[in-house]
Amino acid sequence: PSSGAVTAAADPGEALGKITSKFISPYTAGQSFGNIYLKNSTSKTVDISEELQSPVGFRMEFSSEPEVLIMHTHATESYMLEERDYFTAADATRSTSDAVNMNHIGEKVAEVLRANGIAVVHDMTQHDAEAYTGSYDRSAATVSANLKKYPSIKVVLDLHRDSVGTEAEKIKAVQKIGDKNAAQIMLVMGCEDGSIQNHPN
């Protein structure tokens, strides 16, 4: 068709769509303070300045006991390993290979924390490998088991790879720092609000 629409499965190597580098502006977040931008989707009122001055509620001991747990509800979320501006049918968005999925990213984060004196447990269980449905229930069980085994853990990080775009275009969220591109990072934090209960704020 003249529209260029893909009407049949593409061969590996045939472009299905484009990849666009984009800085997702934090100025649409609604609230900001310094370099912190907040999109508040709850009915709660948040004062970022006040929150930054409030006690955290725990203190890192920098001991040999694990204080951070890194895990992945969707461990098979994967990355492309090369820079290009298109994607094909051969470019998987999920992989059980720890060389290209979130377990690889989690280990890199763990290495940085360990290098700074913070003991880390990195649980590489692939909760979504067999089925996407139920992965949060399975990862919750993993977190509970680790907290029971390592009561010294103070912080749990569930690292994901975001997915922004459409079937025809994938957005690569980046910000240039100096002369290098860096991936943008978003923290998702829940709280008790509306139908969400038993969730400490």
Please describe what each predicted stretch is.
Residues 1-156, 161-201:
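Catalytic-site microenvironment of enzymes
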